[in-house]
């Protein structure tokens, strides 16, 4: 979404304890659906439903992690950094601050410039 969602929509998503647990876990490190199910003690279908809802509001990001053997899977990281609510002259305004998750484990840079920059940093 390019615009911040309505306050009620964001609060509705955040009122769900499973969604909050997923955000909390993925704010520490990117996690797969199975890792989230184990960490947050919920079923994988519950994880997928909540992740989809969080993605609808750009509160979590999905990327593909690639293992050394070529297998790949989705990992999720919270993009929500801060939510502030302001009451001014009879109306509420919400401001959602997002962060760019760091590179996910197993993620390979696909852009040549990214690969070169990474190589240069490691010299």
Question: Model-flagged regions — what are they?
Answer:
Residues 81-123:
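Amphipathic alpha-helical dimerization/coiled-coil segments
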Residues 22, 35-41, 54:
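A short acidic, leucine-rich amphipathic alpha-helix
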Residues 29, 43-45:
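Short coil turns linking two alpha-helices in DNA-binding domains
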Residues 14, 23-30:
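Short helix-to-turn junction characteristic of helix-turn-helix DNA-binding domains
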């Amino acid at each position: 979404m390019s615009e911040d969602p309505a306050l009620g929509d964001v609060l509705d998503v955040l009122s769900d304890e499973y969604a909050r647990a997923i955000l909390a876990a993925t704010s520490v490190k990117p996690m797969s659906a199975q890792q989230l199910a184990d960490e947050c003690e919920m079923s994988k279908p519950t994880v997928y439903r909540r992740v989809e809802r969080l993605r609808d509001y750009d509160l979590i990001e999905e990327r593909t992690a690639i293992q050394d053997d070529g297998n790949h899977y989705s990992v999720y990281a919270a993009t929500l950094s801060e939510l502030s609510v302001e009451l001014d002259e009879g109306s509420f305004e919400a401001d959602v601050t997002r962060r760019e998750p760091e590179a996910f484990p197993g993620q390979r840079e696909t852009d040549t410039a990214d690969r070169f920059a990474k190589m240069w940093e490691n010299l």
